Amino acid sequence: MNMIQIFGTNKSFDCKAAQRFFKERRLPFQFVDLKEKEMSQGEFESVVAVLSKNLGSRTSAIEALIDPKSKDYSSVAYLDDSDKESKLFENQAKLLIQPVCRNGKTEATVGMAQKIWEGWR
């Protein structure tokens, strides 16, 4: 059985809502506070790969992960795609849309995605 991972910060209401969603359905999950421990390169790659498959391109996946409402958005808005990806990886807590949820290596979501989570076990 896959372990569901929720990446986000404790201050995020959506992260709290995601935790509540999985708790209410008695689905085991691990919450990873991005302020304490950011995604490893492998975890980040896995999320980007799944999103790339669903959205059609790696560029779209990176764009989907970046929060345009973030205070630091201007630091990535005009970068080349490859630079955007490395900047996002280096500043996950500040730039990611939260929560980023992942179910094993095959499923991942950005933001609130209850319809998709319904199918997770």
Protein language model features and the residues they cover:
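Local sequence-structure signature of Cys/Sec-based thiol-disulfide redox active-site neighborhoods
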Residues: 1-37
